[in-house]
Amino acid sequence: MTTATDFAKQLRRFLSEYLSHERNVSPNTLSAYRDAFVQYIAYMHTKKGVAVEKLFLKHLTRQNVIGYLNWILDERNCSPATRNYRLAAIHAFVSFLQYNIIEQSEEWQKILSIKAMRTEKKALNYLSQDSIRLLLHQPDVTIWQGRRHLAMLSLMYDTGARVQEIADLTVTASASIVSLTR
């Protein structure tokens, strides 16, 4: 029976205890960080020949992290924004390690000195007034589903809410948002 490596133990503590309980991050953040480390482990296995059961904290070096980030860009064809998200996950883990594995503080500082890439901000495209008017005239208001669709489209237009935010609305939540008057 093999025992977990120091990398595996610290990563489990980071994901299961620190992020979940101490930092109370969202499930989406937790999932994104987990994905970043699944990819890092895959990189270390395929490119560095280090199997997951032999992956130790000594393998978490500035050189390996930079290699991983370049691999994301060059071989996985990810965007600089994705690279930056993966780097943020590694930075968070290394910041956690600074207080738990102080013997390697010098290496942790080197990893934390890796900078994010500059990314281009994408311009938002907006619908013209004519396009919005056309969109709001699409639902068939002679049937209840059409009136419902028009109400949801109007609410999204008037509030700037996203589709998921509208989908997540409940009657009790909408009661505090909408006030009906006679």
Report residues per predicted region.
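Conserved catalytic core of the tyrosine transesterase superfamily
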Residues: 1-182
